């Protein structure tokens, strides 16, 4: 297992935060941002040493422990966003299983289903256009928000957390914030 951490200055203490999750099997990324000041963040990329069901259990345990840690720090998680699964992907089944793991952890810890953001919607929010490539996303996140990453999974998780925080600095971001209020971006709870 390896963990890469990006410390954006978010400190322990009573405050509202939002989390973003880019659920990749080879570089699972989690970001937590301050609602009040979304440039303050902590972001991690977790690489499990396992495969198959062991990897799913390993990621479940790691994510569950991190969210417990956030609550221990005094952070109140107001919302969460995860990247929506692309069904046309060659690894759609494995990513669907991982998506279910993430939803279970969030359900048990937060009792609220996360926002599920399609990749094109996330790209438009973070870069201004829905077709940006990975390197362009890294550059645009730095140019728009002044936050630097050298890992595209970490950058995506940060952008998802920022989107979940409700932050918008321009018309494109405000438009995306309005768009994700549609119930189709969140699982329905009876």
What is the predicted role of each segment?
Residues 1-190:
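Phosphate- and other anionic-substrate recognition elements at nucleic-acid/protein interfaces
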